[in-house]
Design a protein with these regions (language model features):
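Glycine-rich phosphate/ribose-binding loops and adjacent secondary-structure elements
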Residues: 164
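Extended polysaccharide-engagement surfaces of secreted carbohydrate-active enzymes
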Residues: 196-263
Length: 263
């Protein structure tokens, strides 16, 4: 129901798809959810809702993304359109994938555009969306858009495995992990690559399912066990450990906080 209301202009829950550039970010995560749960989330939607999503996603081509992780927001939306059988923009997909490949700096890390930033955007965006966009191409067979061999996907997958090993080692026995960089209000979203690796059965041999499950459970229990990160109405607070509005970024809003659900 929430998916349908988000694109229904008559609903109070209709998202502001056609204003500013930020909706491209929101759309990318909606599209990512459809890619991950295509049969469970996209296929059951009624035809009108599907048409509305395709229209809103297509209209977001008005947004010119900067040469940062934003390129993957455009690419993820377009890859979903491709998977759904709608017309996709090949240039927005290919240029993003090539640019991200150029941004790999080694040992499981990508820079966020021309300059390296010590934050968790490798978790929030770069690893998951890059791998999943490459996967769409790999699974779509031969195409006339980009000669992207299967090794591109395999290489990106191995990089994410290395990054997942680093994330797992960040986690202390008490369930704490280092806090650094912007957007830290996304909390457990920092562990998205580790969760994705486990869910897809892609964990490297150095990490067992039980090991990752125990580590992530410890983090979640520490983060949410005593409800300090929820307000009186049950919504997430603006902060990392309780209500800490001062650590938020200028672009952070209450909806942003639910990036925590990525893990």
């Amino acid at each position: 129901k929430s998916y349908a209301q988000a694109v229904d202009p008559e609903s109070r829950d209709y998202l502001l798809w056609r204003k500013e550039g930020q909706p491209l970010v929101d759309a990318a995560y909606v599209a990512e959810s459809f890619l991950r749960g295509y049969d469970a989330l996209w296929v059951p939607l009624d035809s009108l809702t599907k048409r509305r999503y395709i229209e809103e996603f297509t209209r977001l081509r008005r947004v010119d993304p900067p040469y940062t992780n934003w390129l993957l927001f455009s690419s993820t939306v377009e890859c979903f359109l491709r998977k759904a059988g709608a017309k996709s923009d090949a240039y927005r997909i290919v240029s993003a994938l090539r640019k991200v490949e150029e941004c790999y700096v080694g040992d499981g890390f990508y820079s966020d555009g021309p300059g390296f930033a010590f934050d968790y955007y490798n978790s929030f965006v770069l690893h998951p969306m890059y791998v999943e966009c490459l996967e769409v191409f790999t699974n779509s067979g031969k195409n006339n858009i980009w000669n992207a061999p299967d090794c591109n996907f395999q290489r990106a997958q191995k990089r994410m495995q290395r990054f997942g090993m680093i994330l797992e080692r960040f986690i202390s026995p008490e369930g704490a992990f280092p806090v650094f960089g912007r957007s830290i209000t996304y909390r457990t979203g920092t562990l998205q690559p580790l969760a994705l690796l486990a869910w897809r059965g892609w964990l490297p041999k150095e990490l067992s399912n039980g090991q990752v499950r125990a580590a992530m459970t410890a983090v979640i229990n520490r983060m949410f066990g005593d409800n300090r990160n929820f307000n009186g109405k049950g919504f997430l607070t603006l902060g990392f450990n309780g209500s800490q509005p001062h650590i938020s970024d200028w672009y952070t809003n209450n909806g942003s906080l639910y990036m925590a659900s990525l893990a």
